[in-house]
Amino acid sequence: MNTSISSQPPCIRIFDTTLRDGEQSPGCSMPAQQKLVMARALDALGVDIIETGFPASSQSDYEAMTLIARELRRPTLAVLSRCLQADIETSARALESATKPRLHVFLSTSPLHREHKLRMSKEQVLESVHKHVSLSRTLIDDVEFSAEDATRTEEDFLIEVTRVAIAAGATTINLPDTVGFSTPEEIRNMFTRVIANVEGANKVIFSAHCHDDLGLAVANSLAAIEGGARQIECTINGIGERAGNCALEELTMVLKVRNAFYNIDTSIHTSRIVSTSQLLQRLVGMPVQRNKAVVGANAFAHESGIHQHGMLRHRGTYEIMRPQEVGWVCSHMVLGRHSGRAAVEQRLRALGYLLEEEDLKLVFEEFKQLCEKQRLVTDVDLQVLMQDTTVQHGYRLASMTISDVGNRANALVELSDPQGQRVAETAQGNGPVDALFGALAAATGVKLELDSYQVHSVGIGADARGEANLSVRHNDTQYEGTGTSKDIIEASALAWLEVANRLLRNPENMQNKQNTALA
């Protein structure tokens, strides 16, 4: 592939917005401590830029940025801001502790947005871009400007907006496909023409931020690279507003597997992709579909007899990449009652969990208790421990009893509250799960409205467990929860408690939190 700008770096910058745009996916809200856990994993993955949130819209995002900035030194840390002086100043304060700060400002540019959202003329948009990018540069040296809804903006006006932003000091220009409307050819042509017609284009990095409303986010991001983009904005598992964003794992593996065609690299340590994906699934309670490219459970599964025969002869017949390249590896280390803390920590790191000393101590105590109940501890068991400890500080399930009462079910649950006190409640329902959720609601005081509920098996043979996935609503906001146990009713209780604890840990979630969407 011939790139449009030979002077640009041969390595694509990966801008991960899982903690900002990804979190805007319904049910994927994360409190500050969970964002820190995820940011550590993104750092270990090799992400170049981590967008941590929108500090002006949320105190939790402000706190998350502060926590992350104190710890992470390698990646650039970005925060989003509207073109408003107060937003920009708040964002700059949130970035004060960052070693490599970036201020990311955006403004809509399309005629539809100008007329109905901004109620601004072209001249007013240009004036605002110049004013607020200039202000941002007085506070932070690294400034990214995003022309929201760029792909539906008149080409001549988009060129003018880009010129003004560069003249005002922007170091990165992002041209988003905000509603996932464009096709690869249109995206490629847009980048090619804007770069060719804007003075100073060779002095900045052009970025693409593509949404997946028509399933083209990854294809459009690749087309943007062909048109000259040298930064791609993406998320783990493709989570994000509406249908999501460009999936980091898919984009990076395309560039790796088809490197002879694209001749462009990334800084991503691909062997950490699966563990990072699984960590996110646990944190937000949103599993990926089994046939999801790269990270789905079936991504390297072969059932057809013809395919299996070919694989036995040569793996290359039906596999274009090795499972180990993205982190699909089996542990050869057996964990049990004689395993030490170092062995447990090493396995947790391989699974994508980077723990503070206090959290590791808590997990190891739970590990030793589990070893009293079963001879061996699997990766699935460790992930359940993580869900029960570092993720679920709050109410813990102590015991439960389900019984039939005529045509109804009765549930008795006993919980340990955040202070360690025991709380017991009972409830009746139309079935065991309905009764269980009623008892949990009575015990915690959290009311959740169930939208969907699924149970499936994870693991193989004697190690198999039931995983419960539920989607619930609280104050008209959707949340996802996941629980895993050898008992599916217990797994359901853990999934329910995961959501309840998340709500109780973050008071903002107990209200209607407004997310401001970009691009």
UniProtKB/Swiss-Prot annotation:
Assembly information from the UniProt record: Homodimer.
Organism of derivation: Xylella fastidiosa (strain Temecula1 / ATCC 700964)
Superkingdom of origin: Bacteria
Annotated region described as Regulatory domain, given as residue ranges: 396-519
Major place of residence: cytoplasm
Reactions it catalyzes: 3-methyl-2-oxobutanoate + acetyl-CoA + H2O = (2S)-2-isopropylmalate + CoA + H(+)
Keyword Hydrolase: no
Subcellular location: Cytoplasm
Record has Cell membrane as a keyword: no
Pathway it works in: Amino-acid biosynthesis; L-leucine biosynthesis; L-leucine from 3-methyl-2-oxobutanoate: step 1/4
Lineage of the species this protein comes from: Bacteria, Pseudomonadati, Pseudomonadota, Gammaproteobacteria, Lysobacterales
Family statement: Belongs to the alpha-IPM synthase/homocitrate synthase family. LeuA type 1 subfamily.
Cofactor(s), by name: Mn(2+)
Enzyme Commission code(s) on record: 2.3.3.13
The protein's name in its UniProt record: 2-isopropylmalate synthase
